[in-house]
Amino acid sequence: MTKKRRKLNKDFEKKIYSSKKNVELVLAKIYDIDDEDIQTEYMSAFNNVVYLYDAVKEDYDQQGFHDNSEGLLKNYSNAFNLFESEFEI
């Protein structure tokens, strides 16, 4: 049985790349926090954002672009924006 080809989308790939850079930047800022308690608090709050980013990336790598792709990215974006509004970083 032949494997179904993934549907690719260059604009979506750009959004994933931009999201990756945002996650890396925030993680770097969190790791730069000297106070261990505050760093732990920020990290635990940001873990959900990282999880949602990983879900978007993994889904795209495995299945390509499909009907649910934009929804997954929207969930990530909402979580990222919520984190930014609740935590000053």
Language-model features, listed with the residues they occupy:
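N-terminal acidic leader/helix
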Residues: 3-40
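Extended rod-forming repeat segments used as scaffolds/tethers
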Residues: 20, 29-31, 44, 48-49, ...
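Generic detector of leucine side chains in alpha-helical contexts
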Residues: 8, 25-27, 52, 72-73, ...
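Long, hydrophobic, amphipathic alpha-helical segments used as structural scaffolds
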Residues: 27, 31-34, 57-64, 84-87
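Acidic, low-complexity, intrinsically disordered interaction modules
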Residues: 36-77
